Amino acid sequence: MKYVYLFLPAIGWGLMPLVIASVKNSTVYNQIVGTVAASFIFGAIVMAIMHPAMSWSLFLLSALGGACWVIGQVGQYISYEKIGVSETMPISTGLQLIGVPLVGVLAFGEWSSPQAKLYGFIGILVLIIGVVLTSFTDRGTSEGNKSNQVSTIILLVLTSLGYITSSSIPKALHGNSVSIFFGQTFGMLVAVFIYTLVTKNLHVWKEKSTVQSGGAGILYAIAALAYILSVQDNGVNMAFVISQLCVVISTLGGLIFLHEKKTRKGLIFTIAGLILIIGGAMLTTLF
């Protein structure tokens, strides 16, 4: 089963954007509410079955991480609409792969040896080049005009800070992984409720498109739980690197199944960028 747990996160997180993009007549509000509500229900069921111990400090910090995740996910969903899944995912994933290791080095003392620092910073450089390549837009693509692309990339950079914070908080926590996951889904639920309340979009909670978007939430939750189990069976480095293959599935899936168009030059740059992103991820985690 450890190999199932190893590859399930990449499959689930890779298919998640494709499921969201396939829901007709859905807005960002439908998508984020459906995703989060389904994730919370899944997390609550797992919590009820396994009954892990949980302290208030663990719960509150996990919830904070979940709230930060919502910031990143909203930015990603907006980007799907603006520039497409096939361009959003490599950029978003690359930014997270750059940010999370840097937080680990600065806040948690990771990459303690000179060799680890050397490979780590080379990996970050490779990741940056990969992100730049995947953001290349040639004429005839479906990503929109240049100003639209630049503004969307800026949005991704800013909202990816939410992802980075969400991924970094659990490193400071010591507790059952299922408890942390449930706390995160609760924080996600509260954050999304506040988001829809402030933007006066509470009506989306009962719309059909919101329910249909719940499929993405189930995929996210299953992948997240499988990732926790994969870390236990395969180690954090191997589990993390393999999970990042989700970017390949979502990017190629956007091109093949969602019919997002790129010219030959744009496609070459995208594939080259994907290879560099995966290579950079390996350098920053396996060495």
Curated annotation (Swiss-Prot):
CDD domains: GRP. Keywords: Cell membrane, Membrane, Sugar transport, Transmembrane, Transmembrane helix, Transport. InterPro entries: Sugar_transport. The chain crosses the membrane at residues 4-23, 28-50, 56-78, 91-108, 118-137, 150-169, 179-198, 211-230, 240-259, 266-285. GO terms for cellular component: plasma membrane. It is a multi-pass membrane protein. The keyword Membrane applies. Disulfide bonds: none annotated. GO terms for molecular function: carbohydrate transmembrane transporter activity. The keyword Zinc-finger does not apply. Its main location: membrane. Signal peptide: none annotated. It is found in: Cell membrane. Belongs to the GRP transporter (TC 2.A.7.5) family. This is Putative sugar uptake protein LJ_0170. It comes from Lactobacillus johnsonii (strain CNCM I-12250 / La1 / NCC 533).
